[in-house]
């Protein structure tokens, strides 16, 4: 053990809080009583070229799903698809700039022509901004770009692919959010959390409006995950984080069991506390911010 025992124990406790309850289906709507067989399921996953997305494509490939990998960089996407097909799976790489709504429409049309639609849509691509609110408001272009990628792009994909799911009477939309949405008070993430909160709201409404027609939704409230997206932020260096492979397992669990949400234990606890004592949560978040950003 290279780390000091106390530090190692502290990190393990922190990571335990980042993981979801053992049974994410407990006490929540469960439309799929038996795990869904992913064999042959057409899964479109955005942000598939690296991080959680790349790890998830590999796992879905092992489940014999038809993986449609989407991201901007064709070279990385091709490598992802080649790894899946090399293991005997089925995959295709479709480069797309998700900040371009017309490009998304063209992607949907291409997918419909190639394989006849999508059974499971996973809106994983995202842009994170860690910045004080006042600074974010001074850089309005970053606000707009974050909303476009984190909210408008997923909505546009849903707009294009959901009609086919509804027509077939079966479909699943998995939306990636962040644990900060559940506390509503995470400092330095005003723009990022707002974009993910908007997506989270739509995700829940999908279930209430379309669930009876066979189209379900799941929201994944990820904690800190060790991916290229957080690498530039020095404040995260050395902090406990899930691995991309662990985070990818959440996606597979969601696809197979269709829970309403999967969230870290600590985020669920803070969300419950927020409902009865929001000022306590505000004070907790403020103190945490002062500790991390003295």
Swiss-Prot record:
Residues annotated to bind NADP(+): 49-50, 52, 72, 97-98, 124, 192, 196, 225, 227
Q: Where are the transmembrane segments?
A: none
Q: Which UniProt keywords apply?
A: Host mitochondrion, Lipid metabolism, NADP, Oxidoreductase, Virulence
The entry's cellular-component GO terms read:
host cell mitochondrion; membrane
Q: What is the effect of changing residue 287 to E?
A: Localizes to host mitochondria. Defective in mitochondrial localization
> Keyword Lipoprotein: yes or no?
no
Q: Catalysed reaction(s)?
A: hexadecanal + NADP(+) + CoA = hexadecanoyl-CoA + NADPH + H(+)
Name its GO BP terms in alphabetical order. Answer: lipid metabolic process
> Which InterPro entries does this UniProt record tie to the protein?
NAD(P)-bd_dom_sf, SDR_fam
Question: Pfam families given for it?
Answer: adh_short
Q: Which residues, if any, are the signal sequence? A: none
- Keyword Kinase among UniProt keywords: no
Can you say where in the cell this protein is located? Answer: Host mitochondrion
What factors induce this protein? Expression is enhanced about 10-fold during nutrient starvation and hypoxia.
According to its record, what is known about the domains?
The N-terminal region contains a predicted mitochondrial targeting sequence (MTS), but this does not appear to be required for mitochondrial localization as deletion of the MTS has no impact on localization.
The record describes the protein's role as: Oxidoreductase that promotes the persistence of M.tuberculosis in host macrophages by reprogramming the fatty acid metabolism in host mitochondria. When localized in the host mitochondria, it potentially acts on unknown lipid substrates and converts them into products that directly or indirectly alter the lipid profile of the mitochondria. This change in lipid profile results in increased mitochondrial membrane fluidity, enhanced endogenous fatty acid oxidation and increased mitochondrial spare respiratory capacity.
What family does the entry list? Belongs to the short-chain dehydrogenases/reductases (SDR) family.
Q: What is this protein called?
A: Fatty acyl-CoA reductase Rv0547c
Annotated source species:
Mycobacterium tuberculosis (strain ATCC 25618 / H37Rv)
